């Protein structure tokens, strides 16, 4: 804000506020206000659009690519007889999360999915995951397989359509096993009696509720119809997994990546807003659309790992 005063000679003189005065600070805030508001709105808009695009449009494509590569690797290892049949590989080391372990086929649901080792958000983005503190399907005892209900292909989205008596197959390094559904259960329902000695069971798990808005966990129990395979000892004790591998949990380890990408998005948004006001709208669209979109998708991909793993 400036002021004009009359001098004794009758002329006018412009008086500018000093840099540290309240008037100067108010002028600075008034100038920065539109930039800050526009930058914040742009950052939020890019983030929300990126998350929606990641979950609805890109995640099914990523799931399909992971299934294709996982199936090729699993088929080659099945042919060579090198597929892991326990919690460890041939060198005695714990299997890495994301290792393809088995093929799940549910004819009634038209599901044919490679199952990977592990159940955190990153692994379940590839397909169903085997809970690492349980036995493999076909062995004597209970095995747990978890899968998403909506995002990343939603392989278990119709799991509730299975009824008692329905069957499905699982192929592991020990052969092909058939399971017959016992029943479904939700939170608070009584679990069935544990399988008898020498018998096998699989529990399939996914989320309940509207798509992308999980409210609870659906468990489907199914018993092995034939004889159980050799059962190695567990190396990972039951209920000793990190929280990120439990149902409806996110992976908090990626927070630092989210923060870094958010900083990059905020910086890119600030540059885009400055260019919009000082450079030109057309030039800003041409230069910043690509970088903002790419950074927004990177942020969204990390944010989805913070969301419930059965989403």
Kindly label every feature range from the protein language model:
Residues 265-311:
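Alpha-helical transmembrane segments forming the membrane-embedded cores
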Residues 15-37, 271-280:
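Cytosolic-side transmembrane helix boundary signature
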Residues 7-9, 17, 34, 287-298:
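Alpha-helical membrane segments of multi-pass proteins
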Residues 16-17, 26, 261, 267, ...:
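Short amphipathic alpha-helical "recognition" segments used for binding
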Residues 2-6, 27-260, 304-311:
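Solvent-exposed, non-transmembrane regions of membrane-associated and secreted proteins
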Residues 1-23:
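Acidic/Ser-Thr/Pro-Gly-rich, low-complexity N-terminal segments
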């Amino acid at each position: 804000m400036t002021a004009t005063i009359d001098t004794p000679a009758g002329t006018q003189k412009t008086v500018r506020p000093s840099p540290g005065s309240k008037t100067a600070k108010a002028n600075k805030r008034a100038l920065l206000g539109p930039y800050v508001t526009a930058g914040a709105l742009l950052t939020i808009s890019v983030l929300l659009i990126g998350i929606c695009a990641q979950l609805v449009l890109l995640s099914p494509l990523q799931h399909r690519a992971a299934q294709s590569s996982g199936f090729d690797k699993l088929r080659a290892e099945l042919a060579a007889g090198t597929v892991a049949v326990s919690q460890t590989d041939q060198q005695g080391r714990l299997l890495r999360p994301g290792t393809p372990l088995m093929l799940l086929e549910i004819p009634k649901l038209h599901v044919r999915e490679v199952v990977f080792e592990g159940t955190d958000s990153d692994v379940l983005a590839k397909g169903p995951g085997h809970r690492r503190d349980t036995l493999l399907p076909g062995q004597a005892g209970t095995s747990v397989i978890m899968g998403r209900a909506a995002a990343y292909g939603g392989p278990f989205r119709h799991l509730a359509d299975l009824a008692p008596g329905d069957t499905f197959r699982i192929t592991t390094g020990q052969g092909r096993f058939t399971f017959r559904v016992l029943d479904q259960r939700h939170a608070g329902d009584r679990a069935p009696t544990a399988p008898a000695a020498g018998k096998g069971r699989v529990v399939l798990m996914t989320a309940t509720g509207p798509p992308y808005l999980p409210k609870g966990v659906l468990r489907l129990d199914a018993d092995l119809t034939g004889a159980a395979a050799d059962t190695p000892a567990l190396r990972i004790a039951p209920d000793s997994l990190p929280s990120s591998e439990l149902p409806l949990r996110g992976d908090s380890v990626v927070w630092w990546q989210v923060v870094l990408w958010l900083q990059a998005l905020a910086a890119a948004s600030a540059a885009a807003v400055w260019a919009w006001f000082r450079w030109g709208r057309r030039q800003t669209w041409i230069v910043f659309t690509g970088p903002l979109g790419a950074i927004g998708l990177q942020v969204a991909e990390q944010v989805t790992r913070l969301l419930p793993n059965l989403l």
